């Protein structure tokens, strides 16, 4: 999981969803420093999340340090519908408003619901490249993007230097695996997978240990559905009355005090 931290609270498209990078084939053998149990669990998760169609929800929290050194928390609920290779819809609501993303294989539209403004740009012809493109345009990270990659396991382990399985836990009455990974650059990843053949993600925590205040990203997943059959219309944005089209721009950086 290749990641960089950005305070995305003021960004129009600060979707708490979604590391990013090109598709690659899953490793056949455990990487050095990653236990066989942890590697096997991620491979099983990857097999499940490689489905052509699926949807899920996630409740997320971004924890970051403000200019005065105080830890602040931003909560979101994210709903994701994916149809590989080239359709994606994301609906995010939270403390800083609501934002929708629609990708139909040709264009990507980002709609600020509260502002009734949207930006639409031409996009690459697959989900991974589209997310990478938007990430570069806005200079933000999308911590759930690896789960949307065509090879989620490979991308999740990208940059990881060590990994192991911790003690088993129970989540909502169901057994789960608790895995811990360290990534170069002082980033720690914890992921909880449903202890079934599907091994769907149940929780994710990303901690940036070397940054001031050790900011983190937390996600709790639910409602995984691999039997969904979304229509093409779900991925096409229809501007509501009075909506204004704007340019897609990166957020302005605050000047240091």
Which residues are covered by each model-predicted region?
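Sec/Tat signal peptide C-region and signal peptidase I cleavage site
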Residues: 22-26
């Amino acid at each position: 999981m290749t990641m960089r931290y950005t305070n995305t609270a003021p960004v129009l498209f600060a979707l708490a969803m979604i590391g990013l990078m090109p598709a690659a084939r899953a490793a056949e053998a455990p990487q050095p420093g990653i236990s066989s149990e942890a590697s096997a669990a991620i491979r099983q998760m990857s097999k499940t999340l490689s489905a052509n169609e699926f949807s899920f929800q996630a409740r997320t929290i971004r924890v970051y340090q403000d200019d005065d050194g105080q830890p602040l928390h931003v909560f979101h609920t994210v709903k994701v519908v994916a149809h590989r290779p080239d359709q994606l819809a994301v609906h995010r609501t939270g403390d800083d408003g609501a934002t929708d993303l629609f990708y139909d294989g040709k264009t990507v539209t980002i709609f600020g619901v509260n502002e009734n403004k949207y930006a639409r740009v031409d996009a690459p012809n697959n989900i991974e490249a589209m997310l990478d493109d938007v990430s570069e345009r806005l200079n933000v990270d999308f911590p759930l993007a690896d789960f949307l990659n065509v090879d989620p396991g490979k991308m999740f382990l990208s940059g990881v230097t060590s990994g192991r399985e911790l003690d088993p836990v129970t989540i909502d009455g169901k057994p789960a695996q608790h895995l811990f990974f360290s990534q170069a650059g002082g980033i720690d990843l914890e992921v909880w997978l449903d202890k079934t053949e599907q091994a769907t993600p149940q929780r994710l925590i990303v901690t940036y240990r070397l940054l001031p205040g050790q900011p983190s990203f937390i996600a709790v997943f639910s409602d995984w559905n691999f039997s969904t059959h979304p229509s093409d219309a779900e991925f096409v944005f229809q501007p509501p009355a009075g909506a204004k089209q704007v340019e897609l721009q990166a957020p302005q950086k605050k000047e240091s005090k």
